[in-house]
Amino acid sequence: MFRNIQKRNISSSGRVLLNHGKPQNPVYNAELTMKIEPIQRTGESIDVKRARLVYQSRKRGILESDLLLSRFAKRYLSGFSQEELDEYDKLLDEPDWDIYYWATKNYDVTPLPDKWKNSKILKLLQEDAENKEKEILRMPEL
């Protein structure tokens, strides 16, 4: 059955032009920004809010943020007042990588906006992210 199949030589020139000589990844001058407004929650009890914030701290989608925020939530959320919980809730509405870079004080990658410069919650998160105890970071138990 396969005796009559001829071998084919497939060759190409050593020179391949992609995108007709144009750069593969063109530089765009315009910055695309899209912000999805957070859900406005009304009538949420403080216990439900704490539980939601713990969940949102653990399930960010980026491991680095998950580790920092879940550890922070485990340590501090139970003692936060309503105002502190509201501020932490607003912080969690920010993009994951921004929170990570702000927590690690890496402002050259993502500059810190004015609205977070005097945040005591962010300062507490930054102190926690320094990991002065040199603990191995892992997700806290539920």
Curated annotation (Swiss-Prot):
Q: Report keywords, A-Z.
A: Chaperone, Mitochondrion
According to its UniProt record, where is this protein located? Mitochondrion matrix
Q: Name one GO cellular component term.
A: mitochondrial matrix
InterPro entries found in the cross-reference section = SDH, SDH_sf, SDHAF2
Q: Which Pfam families match?
A: Sdh5
Biological process, per Gene Ontology? mitochondrial electron transport, succinate to ubiquinone; mitochondrial respiratory chain complex II assembly; protein-FAD linkage; tricarboxylic acid cycle
Q: Does the keyword Mitochondrion apply?
A: yes
* Other facts noted in the record for this chain: This protein may be expected to contain an N-terminal transit peptide but none has been predicted.
Q: Which PANTHER family match?
A: PROTEIN EMI5 HOMOLOG, MITOCHONDRIAL, SUCCINATE DEHYDROGENASE ASSEMBLY FACTOR 2, MITOCHONDRIAL
Q: Which family does it belong to?
A: Belongs to the SDHAF2 family.
* Biological role stated in the UniProt entry: Plays an essential role in the assembly of succinate dehydrogenase (SDH), an enzyme complex (also referred to as respiratory complex II) that is a component of both the tricarboxylic acid (TCA) cycle and the mitochondrial electron transport chain, and which couples the oxidation of succinate to fumarate with the reduction of ubiquinone (coenzyme Q) to ubiquinol. Required for flavinylation (covalent attachment of FAD) of the flavoprotein subunit of the SDH catalytic dimer.
The subunit field of the Swiss-Prot or TrEMBL record says: Interacts with the flavoprotein subunit within the SDH catalytic dimer.
Q: Could you tell me what this protein is called?
A: Succinate dehydrogenase assembly factor 2, mitochondrial
- The species is Debaryomyces hansenii (strain ATCC 36239 / CBS 767 / BCRC 21394 / JCM 1990 / NBRC 0083 / IGC 2968) (Yeast)
